[in-house]
Design a protein with these regions (language model features):
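Basic, alpha-helical nucleic-acid-binding regions used in initiation and control of genome expression
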Residues: 1-330
Length: 330
């Protein structure tokens, strides 16, 4: 018979933790190899196994209610039932581009959890504002998280990023952010560092044990404010309207310097990453507008969190008018 009583030792739930992370912690607490926990509970897990079949027996073994476990682990959330309390705004674990990262180590310690925790997260959660730790791009384990108290502009950029999603909509900011990173770091690769800013930043971010962050991680942290500013520019509609009306992107290019993203920026050739992105961006919109399909927009611009039901989003920033004929809200 399957075990229906809690295991001798249980572990605390952690918000948005991945199922594998939770199973690993529960197994470790009971001195079991991770791959032996589910067989002990007589739970068979394969790629074709519906995830919710694990919910009831796992909740019993963990000594928590079914509802508590369901709300803690996004894999158990039903994305087709967005009006269920606690689901709206949670990471979509089934998304192909869903992000898993280590939780802030100081947050887990504050929760009384000693073992590492991996969470489903969203593109904007790069800084833990409570503890001023970099927890985003470039972090693969909790020990790599860097205290960024000495670079307050990066902390402010986290708040700016959050404000951008309120202004433009999470869907569009999320779509622009990875492209902004790619564009900006391509620019950096072709520029010199005459003042050795990178080495100075690495020395500034060296921890108490004398360990400096890796070069790529330092770049991600130091230039995060510029990446966020570029994200806001690309996610906005002003440049799009001006480009459609005039047939050129002069205004967009001027804003790169005016907003302090890259001083003196002038694209020298059509292969410039920003120009290539603009062409690709308009091609996607023209393709979607021609087919006039919401599914195509959902494929090109997926929602990374569970959205509210359709009737709640009539005037939401998550939907937009197509910039090309035939005009319709997508």
């Amino acid at each position: 018979m399957p075990l229906r009583a809690p295991l001798p030792r249980t572990v605390s739930l952690f918000h948005n933790e991945t199922l594998d992370s939770f199973l690993g912690r529960l197994a470790a607490a009971n001195h079991l190899p991770a791959d032996q926990l589910l067989p002990l509970l007589e739970i068979r897990r394969t790629k074709k196994t519906p995830i919710n079949t694990l919910l009831e027996p796992l909740a019993a073994a963990a000594g928590v209610t079914r509802t508590a476990l369901e709300l803690a682990l996004p894999e158990f959330l039903d994305t087709d039932a967005p009006d269920k309390p606690g689901t709206i705004g949670r990471p979509r674990a089934t998304l192909r581009t869903a992000i898993q990262r280590p939780a802030c180590r100081r947050c887990t310690h504050a929760a009384g959890i000693a073992l590492p925790v991996t969470c489903w997260t969203t593109h904007d959660r790069n800084v833990c504002l409570c503890h001023r730790l970099w927890i985003g791009d470039g972090i693969t384990n909790a020990d790599e998280q860097v205290d960024i108290s000495r670079i307050p502009d990066t902390v402010r950029a986290q708040r700016h990023h959050r404000n951008l999603m309120t202004r433009h909509g999470r869907r569009w900011v999320r779509s622009a952010y990875p492209e902004a990173r790619k564009i900006y770091f391509t620019w950096l690769e072709s520029s010199a560092d005459p003042f050795e800013l990178l080495n100075t930043a690495r020395r500034l971010l060296t921890d108490g044990a004398g360990k400096a962050p890796a070069r790529d991680l330092t770049l991600a942290m130091v230039f995060h404010p510029q990446v966020v500013a570029l994200t806001g520019l690309l996610a906005g509609r002003e440049w799009e309207r001006r480009a459609v009306a005039t047939g050129h992107v002069t205004w967009l290019i001027e804003q790169i310097t005016l907003r302090g993203i890259l001083l003196g920026y002038v694209p020298k050739e059509r292969q410039d990453p920003l120009i290539q992105w603009v062409e690709q961006h308009f091609s996607l919109h023209k393709f979607a507008a021609f087919h006039r399909s919401r599914r195509i927009y959902d494929a090109f611009f997926p929602r990374e969190t569970i959205p509210p039901s359709r009737h709640h989003e009539e005037v939401s920033t998550e939907t937009r008018w197509s910039p090309f004929h035939p005009y319709y809200r997508c």
